[in-house]
Amino acid sequence: MNLLIKGGRVVDPSQNIDDTMDLLVEDGRIKEIGKGLKAPAGAEIIDAAGLLVTPGLIDMHVHLRDPGLEYKEDIVTGTRAAAAGGFTSVACMPNTKPVNDNKAITSYIVNKAAKEALVNVFPVGSITQGSKGESLAEMGELKESGCVAVSDDGRPVVNGELMRRALEYAKGMGIMVISHSEELALVGEGVMNEGFTATELGLKGIPWAAEDVAVARDVYLAEFTDSPLHIAHISTSGSVRIIRNAKARGVKVTCETAPHYFSLTDDAVRGYNTNAKMNPPLREAADVAAIKAGLADGTIDAIATDHAPHHLDEKDLEFNLALNGIVGLETSLPLSLQLVEEGVVDLKVLLEKMTCNPAKILGIDRGTLKVGAAADITVIDPDREWLVAAEKLASKSKNSPFIGRKMKGAAVYTVVGGKVVYKID
């Protein structure tokens, strides 16, 4: 299929482009980018006047729950939600059932995605067998079968020696280690951020030190082994400071945060709202400010949703019993665009964190509109206002703290491999 996207504001950080231009797609790849392009016979034409045209957004941290937990989400519904949110590529975490720690599970995901997914799916394998933190998984096998990174996400690798070996082996194999940095002994029975709100609500708190101590350990291990390391979903001012200092020393560390960590504070838990329960927990206003500062100065490399769908029965419980996690694929873009509205970052910097930076961290050939690249494109209306309604979410699960919130900014077209996979109503 041939496609011409005309007259949009093309913003591609990978090429330092920000101009009103046309984009021509032929045979699933970017054929030409420029002004006044002519549509070939039979080409589909998208009028993008007044809209943003960007490289397809990449979410490097999602939970598709497939295989084994399809009652929460599956590859079809998860990628449908991704497309609705403007994402053309997602990296899916290994805490499936069974855990993605071997070639068979990775191959299942790759093959099912090839047949049924609306967007590109890049599997992440587990660091340890069964994500139990006892012995390393076969990283070489995981990479060969299609994994772009390894992580025990959902749990930390508690054993420091094992984490050291993981970093060393992954370095040799050229695959990224993604750390879920959390000191479980400090977490204890905590269910939300430790602070005034937790005390007021009578809930056990999780101190910021539970994250910071683990981030510091993993940063030092990366420095000691001279290995690349990516730290997932940072939420505290301390994590930002530790990573900023590490980068200044030349440590090969990158990190991500999630939209909820710069959009909400632990006040969202008031009323015992289990849709505001996640791990790491929502923090205080000072942490939100630090996360925004980290995004602004480049300490934080990527924005990823940590899309974590759960069935209503797993959330409609008393707060202590409800599972951690929220869906985020369909609300990430407007929440992130708010950073531009507030002057935290400019549009080019924001898009770096949602396109070329995640692609670079994962080592995938996406996140660019260069001629010859795969035609993964997101067309965005930054001014479109809409209401987050549970019944309109494409995800199988509806566990979002943003239900009922008015949003500004939406994907109007999502194009994967030159094919329009989503068009807004």
From Swiss-Prot:
<dbReference type="InterPro" id="IPR032466">
    <property type="entry name" value="Metal_Hydrolase"/>
</dbReference>
<dbReference type="InterPro" id="IPR004722">
    <property type="entry name" value="DHOase"/>
</dbReference>
<comment type="function">
    <text>Catalyzes the reversible cyclization of carbamoyl aspartate to dihydroorotate.</text>
</comment>
<dbReference type="Pfam" id="PF01979">
    <property type="entry name" value="Amidohydro_1"/>
</dbReference>
<dbReference type="GO" id="GO:0008270">
    <property type="term" value="F:zinc ion binding"/>
</dbReference>
<dbReference type="GO" id="GO:0044205">
    <property type="term" value="P:'de novo' UMP biosynthetic process"/>
</dbReference>
<feature type="binding site">
    <location>
        <position position="63"/>
    </location>
    <ligand>
        <name>Zn(2+) 1</name>
    </ligand>
</feature>
<feature type="binding site">
    <location>
        <position position="180"/>
    </location>
    <ligand>
        <name>Zn(2+) 2</name>
    </ligand>
</feature>
<feature type="binding site">
    <location>
        <position position="153"/>
    </location>
    <ligand>
        <name>Zn(2+) 2</name>
    </ligand>
</feature>
<feature type="binding site">
    <location>
        <begin position="63"/>
        <end position="65"/>
    </location>
    <ligand>
        <name>substrate</name>
    </ligand>
</feature>
<feature type="active site">
    <location>
        <position position="306"/>
    </location>
</feature>
<comment type="similarity">
    <text>Belongs to the metallo-dependent hydrolases superfamily. DHOase family. Class I DHOase subfamily.</text>
</comment>
<dbReference type="GO" id="GO:0004151">
    <property type="term" value="F:dihydroorotase activity"/>
</dbReference>
<comment type="pathway">
    <text>Pyrimidine metabolism; UMP biosynthesis via de novo pathway; (S)-dihydroorotate from bicarbonate: step 3/3.</text>
</comment>
<feature type="binding site">
    <location>
        <position position="310"/>
    </location>
    <ligand>
        <name>substrate</name>
    </ligand>
</feature>
<keyword id="KW-0378">Hydrolase</keyword>
<dbReference type="GO" id="GO:0004038">
    <property type="term" value="F:allantoinase activity"/>
</dbReference>
<dbReference type="InterPro" id="IPR050138">
    <property type="entry name" value="DHOase/Allantoinase_Hydrolase"/>
</dbReference>
<keyword id="KW-0665">Pyrimidine biosynthesis</keyword>
<dbReference type="InterPro" id="IPR011059">
    <property type="entry name" value="Metal-dep_hydrolase_composite"/>
</dbReference>
<keyword id="KW-0479">Metal-binding</keyword>
<dbReference type="InterPro" id="IPR002195">
    <property type="entry name" value="Dihydroorotase_CS"/>
</dbReference>
<feature type="binding site">
    <location>
        <position position="306"/>
    </location>
    <ligand>
        <name>Zn(2+) 1</name>
    </ligand>
</feature>
<feature type="binding site">
    <location>
        <position position="61"/>
    </location>
    <ligand>
        <name>Zn(2+) 1</name>
    </ligand>
</feature>
<feature type="binding site">
    <location>
        <position position="95"/>
    </location>
    <ligand>
        <name>substrate</name>
    </ligand>
</feature>
<protein>
    <recommendedName>
        <fullName>Dihydroorotase</fullName>
        <ecNumber>3.5.2.3</ecNumber>
    </recommendedName>
</protein>
<dbReference type="InterPro" id="IPR006680">
    <property type="entry name" value="Amidohydro-rel"/>
</dbReference>
<keyword id="KW-0862">Zinc</keyword>
<feature type="binding site">
    <location>
        <position position="279"/>
    </location>
    <ligand>
        <name>substrate</name>
    </ligand>
</feature>
<dbReference type="GO" id="GO:0005737">
    <property type="term" value="C:cytoplasm"/>
</dbReference>
<feature type="binding site">
    <location>
        <position position="233"/>
    </location>
    <ligand>
        <name>Zn(2+) 2</name>
    </ligand>
</feature>
<dbReference type="GO" id="GO:0006145">
    <property type="term" value="P:purine nucleobase catabolic process"/>
</dbReference>
<feature type="binding site">
    <location>
        <position position="153"/>
    </location>
    <ligand>
        <name>Zn(2+) 1</name>
    </ligand>
</feature>
